[in-house]
Amino acid sequence: MYRIRETNDYIQLTYLFYDNGLEIEPGAESEHEVVKCWECVTQKNGALIGGASLEIRAGEYVVADVAVEQKYRGLHIGVELMEKAEEETKRRGGKRAWLVAKVPGFYTKLGWDIVERREAPDISKCFTCERYGKDCHPQIMRKNF
């Protein structure tokens, strides 16, 4: 039904991320070092239905973006994308990875822990955003390997 593969087209993924509620500028390069990206496409026609990116921020591995089109959620695509990012972090010698979660429950099921903001590296602009604490309540999370 679908396949996940590496991609160098971060720009294409930004549109998917934006369309699925991530606060990212569509069509813009990342401000950080993009380590690797993955796309999930349908086998039938190659339509882009999911994606993820792994970046280096403040010297740490960060799962920067993960998104799956609404109608394909529940098929474990997000889980598989997270596994790719975690495997790549470990392959590169990373002892942990970080993320900023809009849906922390998804990540806790995958073994990620919520971390107090003061204990986390500076990996996000969320806490200076005008939406923070109003209609957006992100959590910084970490997974040790």
Could you tell me what each predicted segment is?
Residues G46-E55, E60-A67:
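Conserved beta-strand in the GNAT
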Residues M1-G27, V41-T42, A47, P138-I140, ...:
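Short amphipathic alpha-helix that is part of the acyltransferase structural core
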Residues A120-F145:
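C-terminal "cap" of GNAT-fold acetyltransferases
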Residues A101-F127:
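Conserved active-site alpha-helix within GNAT-family acetyltransferase domains
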Residues E25, E29-C40, V62, D135-H137:
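A short helix-loop-beta-strand connector motif used in the catalytic cores of GNAT acetyltransferases and
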Residues V68, G74-E87, W98-L99:
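Conserved acetyl-CoA-binding loop-helix of GNAT-fold acetyltransferases
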Residues R92-K95, V100:
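Internal catalytic or translocation cores that form aromatic/hydrophobic pockets or channels
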